[in-house]
Amino acid sequence: GVFILLSWLPTTFAFAQQNEQQKDTIQKLDEVTVSAQQILGSKFQARNRTGSAYYISPQEIQKMGYTDINRMLKAVPGVNVYEEDGYGLRPNISLRGTKAERSEKITLMEDGILAAPAPYAAPAAYYFPNAARMQAVEVVKGSSQVQYGPFTTGGAINMVSTAIPTKFSAKLSASSGTNSTLKTHINAGDSKKHFGYMVEYLRYQSDGFKHFENKQNAGFKRNDLIAKFKVNTAKTEGANHSFELKVGYADEDSNETYVGLTQSDFARTPFLRYVGSQKDHLTTRHTQWVGTYLLQFSNRLKFTTHFYYNTFFRNWYKLESVKY
């Protein structure tokens, strides 16, 4: 009985060691998506990027459920934000200690295209892409963002919009909250052998948490419409050609102001708006046309060309000064 026990133990030990070795040799690699609209494409690419980079994945965005870009970016190291309107409509973002006002010292992009109204001349971001319709957010800092825009000391943020799906899919989400806050998000798309499309609409509105003494609200309304169309050749062993056209329209109507409160009024009623700012009103309109040609020879070699045209209109009527 003792001999049998001793002879069985080495066999059992060898079998367990072999299983452990097999488990150690199996490594699951993160999926890498080749896209002309993304800088990183995955957390794996972000970890292996020269310099500092961070990738907020679609799964993370879905789990967060935020419409405010400020909240999304709080998990990213080296990013500082300060609130202005409480909804992230005009965020103030600082990367690595740069000036945060209007995010004017960072490079802001959507799908790899400069999104600020005048990124080289007047980069103050009075327009910021709606975070609620994004599927990913990419942040690159330091040396890793030199190639993307005029600001090389801070970093760049690339907002990745909803991609054309590989098969038919449709999504409808609606939510409501306090202060008559409503959000409706709809998108649908499909891809065939040589053609694909995606249409998306976002409506976001609220009466706001501030109010006048006459109970008039200080809220906003936003509309955002995006359409994408893509044609491509068959994926053979040779070069693969594709062309994608993206058309977008966005507008905003808000009762926003620069006027604050005195210290005593803030301590008594922090959400009060002075009647002098009752006529303050902001309207914006943004359109975009983006054409992307991609010539892909392999997973390591591709040629990308972007053609884009953006327009931005802004009228902000606001109280300038009060004399008494």
Regions found by a protein language model. Give the residues of each.
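N-terminal periplasmic "start-of-domain" segments of outer-membrane beta-barrel proteins
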Residues: 31-64, 89-92, 106
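Outer-membrane beta-barrel pore domains and translocons
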Residues: 37, 142, 160, 173-179, ...
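Non-catalytic regulatory/gating segments with a bias toward low-complexity or hydrophobic composition
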Residues: 61, 73, 137-138, 157-159, ...
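Extracytoplasmic beta-strand/coil segments of soluble accessory domains associated
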Residues: 70-117
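Short acidic/polar hinge/loop motifs at secondary-structure boundaries
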Residues: 113-141
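Transmembrane beta-barrel wall of Gram-negative outer-membrane proteins
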Residues: 176-205, 213-257, 281-298
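Flexible, surface-exposed loop regions and adjacent strand-edge segments
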Residues: 215-221, 256-270, 320-324
